[in-house]
From Swiss-Prot:
Provides the rickettsial cell with host ATP in exchange for rickettsial ADP. This is an obligate exchange system. This energy acquiring activity is an important component of rickettsial parasitism. The keyword Membrane applies. The gene is tlcB. Pfam families: TLC. Its main location: membrane. This is ADP,ATP carrier protein 2. The chain crosses the membrane at residues 31-51, 67-87, 99-119, 130-150, 154-174, 192-212, 231-251, 292-312, 333-353, 357-377, 393-413, 451-471, 474-494. One of its GO terms (cellular component) is plasma membrane. It is found in: Cell membrane.
């Protein structure tokens, strides 16, 4: 055997080794599908992280954390329901690829309008603050609704920012992934989609910290502005628009190179994969499906558990970092470390799902969130009794420790969500037929997520409406009790759904 044949044999053995399939299970001929989808996830999630940091920082520092529950209940939930109706109507008259581009373009258009028109001229578009204060004096129990009215453009930006991950990523992106990914490819593809997509957490965290500083490369474009918040917003929106345009270009590439290559049959200038069932017919299928019901339980549980902690955590962060620039810089640091842990979790998660199965990949998220959440609530509730611990650790106040623990909770919960929860949730859709994958998925992912947030928001809404001067600290015990119940139901849902999923795969 000559040297060339020997090298070829070694290369062949390396490519087909067990180690190679564990570390990199993607085959060469699959890269034309895998790479564009991974890049598309990267830029969609880049926008998601930038918008999330903006909306949280601006709303919490310029309004308050207590208003979040009112926005989630009375803003996000109705908008989510309206979207499902609109989405189903659009799916009946055009292809899902066209729907992706229309909806993504609408989001980018709104972000542009908000960043360059609504926020810079908010004094013109918003009602007089003195008028709002007068109404609050007369109607104290409607205080937070009046505050929302007084800052309506900022609230609308928050709602659109919340809908981006649910609609563009969870629904539209994963719908495309489910459409072009085969059942045997899913265990290998999905965790690595997440791995490559979530590397943007490191990038976006760095970008956020960079633009939160006084000097950055876009500053000359806005040198004439005096408002630091306006400069910050316009800089971020510029990056978001560029990233959004890249998303549209990548989606067009995937549509032409993958979707059309697999399905190019046309009849009367219409794609044969356009859905024709009505929303009512779709709802009947969803309501009679226990399988979809348990998927919805998982989505609701995650959304609700996040909602129960998030407001309290942000209220603590605001106490420590009251300035918008400092708040968003802290958010960037949390995102960066979330990215680090996500990369580690993605490598481990891919092997975990392939070796031990769907159940163990899905059960880690609720268990980790439960443990970290209970620790955070406990430290918050007993904040006034942490003096000795604070002095021992050398910190200036218990608030520093609580914010640190809250940051750890966020890092752990988001990293396992990105690396395991999203992938395992999408895997259970694959055995379903096309109708359930599209309209059924829309109802579960959009309405399910919003109902989960709304249930958590109802508790806070009622508390803050009855006691207008209350803050998150005052209801921490109630939030902790509800959080524990939700996590227990979540774990039960994973167990039952695992049994259903195994039966469907076997059939």
């Amino acid at each position: 055997m000559n040297i060339v044949d020997s090298n070829c044999t070694i290369w062949h053995k390396a490519r087909n080794s067990k180690f190679r399939h564990i570390v990199w299970p993607i085959r060469s001929y699959e890269l034309t599908k895998f790479i564009p989808m991974a890049l598309l996830m990267f830029f969609i999630l880049l926008n998601q992280n930038l918008v999330r940091s903006l909306k949280d920082s601006f709303v919490v520092t310029l309004i308050s954390s207590e208003v979040l529950s009112f926005i989630k209940l009375w803003g996000e939930m109705p908008m989510g329901v309206l979207f499902v109706i609109l989405y189903s109507k659009l799916c009946n008259i055009m292809t899902t690829e066209q729907v992706f581009r229309i909806i993504t373009g609408t989001f980018l258009f709104f972000f542009t309008i908000f960043g360059f028109i609504l926020f810079p001229y908010k004094e013109f578009f918003h009602p007089d603050p003195e008028l709002i204060n007068q109404y609050i004096t007369v109607l104290p129990h409607l205080k937070w609704f009046l505050i929302i009215w007084g800052q309506w453009s900022l609230v609308l930006f928050y709602i659109m920012g919340e809908l981006w991950p649910v609609i563009v990523f969870t629904l539209l992106y994963w719908q495309l992934a489910n459409k072009i990914t085969k059942v045997e490819e899913a265990p290998r593809f999905y965790s690595f989609f997440t791995l490559f997509g979530q590397t943007n957490l490191l990038f976006s965290g760095t970008v956020i910290i960079y633009f939160a500083k006084s000097e950055h490369f876009l500053l000359p474009l806005f040198a004439h502005l005096n408002d630091t918040n306006e400069i910050l917003l316009k800089s971020f929106i510029t990056v978001i628009l560029l990233s959004g345009l890249i998303c549209l270009a990548l989606h067009k590439l995937i549509d032409k190179s993958v979707v059309e290559a697999d399905k190019n049959i046309k009849f009367k200038n219409q794609r044969t994969d356009i859905l024709k069932l009505s929303l009512i017919e779709s709802a009947k299928i969803i309501l009679t499906s226990r399988y979809l019901g348990f998927i919805c339980l998982l989505v609701m549980s995650y959304s609700m558990s996040i909602n129960l902690i998030e407001g309290l955590w942000m209220s603590k962060v605001k106490q420590l970092y009251p300035a918008t620039k400092d708040f968003i810089s802290y958010h960037g640091e949390v995102l960066f470390w979330t990215g680090v842990l996500t990369l580690v979790s993605a490598f481990l998660g891919s092997s975990l799902i392939r070796i031990y199965g769907w159940f163990w990949g899905a059960i880690i998220t609720p268990i980790m969130m439960f443990v970290a959440g209970v620790i955070f609530f406990s430290f918050t509730i007993f904040e006034n009794h942490l003096g000795n611990i604070v002095n021992t650790l050398g910190y200036s106040s218990p608030l520093v420790i609580i914010v640190f623990i809250g940051g750890l909770w966020h890092v752990f919960s988001k990293s396992v969500k990105y690396s395991l929860f999203d992938a395992t949730k999408e895997m259970v859709y694959i055995p379903l037929d096309n109708e359930i994958k599209t309209k059924g998925k829309a109802a579960v992912d959009v309405i399910g997520a919003k109902i989960g947030k709304s249930i958590g928001a109802v508790i806070q809404f009622i508390s803050f409406s009855i006691f207008p001067n209350a803050v998150h600290n005052d209801i921490a015990g109630l939030l902790m009790f509800t959080f524990i119940i939700v996590c227990i139901l979540w774990i039960y849902g994973v167990k039952v759904l695992s049994q259903y999923n195994n039966k469907m795969i076997q059939n």
